[in-house]
Amino acid sequence: MAEQTEKAFLKQPKVFLSTKKTGKGKRPGKGGNRFWKSIGLGFKTPREAIEGTYIDKKCPFTGNVSIRGRILAGTCHSAKMNRTIIVRRNYLHFIKKYQRYEKRHSNIPAHISPAFRVKEGDHVIIGQCRPLSKTVRFNVLKVIPAGSSSGAKKAFTGM
């Protein structure tokens, strides 16, 4: 079913892998040999999550993670970690004494499902979930490639 690269056998916990009977149609979470769900909030489940073969228990579409809380947007600053990216959010902070703004940024680590392909500079939308590790509390819900203009707003380009 999936690429077995770990020492433990990887499988989705809600899927029965034996051959009792064949699966029915492609309803969310039912039938076939793959569990997937719609996370709601206006986000579509990626085709790779439905038809892919990856196993990721921290994926919001195929794993045991629910999205609740904040929905944020930012730019992928680093994609060097395994299934984790750093999202940079730029903002302006007002200095009362000088009546001016200064540029600031915050880095947010976010888990990215293997259903997405992301490069540095891509715009991403992330949603808050339960703590996935010591620092990761967000999950990538949508990737907007850097070259496209849909949904991307012009902001200052960094320091």
UniProtKB/Swiss-Prot annotation:
Similarity section: Belongs to the universal ribosomal protein uS17 family.
Recorded GO CC terms: cytosolic small ribosomal subunit
Keywords: Ribonucleoprotein, Ribosomal protein, RNA-binding, rRNA-binding
GO biological process, one term: translation
Protein name: Small ribosomal subunit protein uS17
Biological source species: Glycine max
Single Gene Ontology MF annotation: structural constituent of ribosome
Highest taxon of the lineage: Eukaryota
Keyword check for Ribosomal protein: yes
One Pfam family it belongs to: Ribosomal_S17
